[in-house]
């Protein structure tokens, strides 16, 4: 598994994909951090992280589109199935490599509360909880993109479908509001597909255990389908 992780992680930075993902996310975060937190004086990072969500939904498909689609197109997926390494470990290695690329950005984000602290008192705990929530949301989004990539040979189709799924999930609260407001069974099912809502639960700086469990269950369910 660790050999797969290292190989995949290295491959992302041997071409433009890894650098593009890290740079784009970091640049947009830096822009909103400057506007919201430094210029306008907001002490909370939640608003900055929320502002880059749409860009993140565009960046994730670019990162995940080749995870399995490229193997299926080149027919190298058969080698993975017959390799002495269990398929589950190969899948986990690929996933952790993409998560590590995303974590490069998160590591930089973790420095920003310290920058704000130099200008005055800020809610440090709430800031780091917001970063943790965004990391969990990103981890679930990457799992979705990886799952979709395993369904097709085309990287373009994988990228487009991943964005569509993430965008629909992002808009799920609005969509369920149009369907019904009385909390019927349909809205409850649709709310289970909303990856973004658990992230919003961290807005007040509360470490919501149910949101963490939701992301953990989502990841486990998607990985089980990838290895089956």
Predicted regions located by residue number:
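Aromatic- and glycine-rich beta-strand/loop motifs that create alpha-glucan
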Residues: 1-18
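Hydrophobic alpha-helical transmembrane segments
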Residues: 19-22, 128-132, 159-160, 212-216
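Secretory targeting signals
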Residues: 29-34, 45, 55, 97-158, ...
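Transmembrane helix segments
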Residues: 32-35, 152-203, 207
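Long, hydrophobic alpha-helical segments
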Residues: 48-70, 105
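Helix-loop-helix units of permease transmembrane domains in multi-pass membrane transporters
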Residues: 67-97
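Conserved small/polar residues in nucleotide/adenosyl-binding loops
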Residues: 220-227
């Amino acid at each position: 598994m660790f050999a797969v992780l290292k190989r995949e992680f290295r491959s992302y930075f041997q071409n433009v994909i890894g650098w593009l993902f890290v740079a784009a996310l970091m640049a947009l975060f830096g822009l909103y951090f400057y506007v919201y937190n430094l210029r306008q004086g907001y002490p909370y990072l939640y608003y900055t992280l929320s502002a880059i969500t749409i860009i993140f939904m565009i960046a994730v498909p670019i990162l995940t589109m080749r995870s399995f689609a490229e193997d299926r197109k080149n027919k190298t997926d058969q080698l993975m199935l017959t390799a002495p390494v269990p398929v589950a470990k190969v899948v986990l290695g690929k996933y952790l490599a993409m998560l590590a690329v995303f974590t490069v950005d998160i590591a930089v984000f973790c420095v920003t509360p310290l920058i704000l602290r130099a200008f005055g008192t800020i809610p440090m705990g709430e800031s780091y909880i917001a970063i943790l929530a965004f990391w969990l949301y990103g981890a679930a989004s990457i799992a979705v993109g990886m799952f979709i990539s395993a369904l097709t040979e085309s990287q373009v189709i994988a990228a487009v479908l991943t964005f569509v799924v993430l965008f629909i999930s992002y808009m799920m609260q609005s969509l369920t509001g149009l369907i019904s407001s009385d909390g019927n069974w349909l809205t409850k099912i649709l709310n289970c597909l909303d990856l973004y809502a658990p992230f919003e639960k961290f807005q007040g700086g509360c470490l919501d255990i149910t949101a963490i469990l939701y992301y953990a269950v989502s990841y486990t369910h998607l990985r089980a389908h990838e290895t089956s």
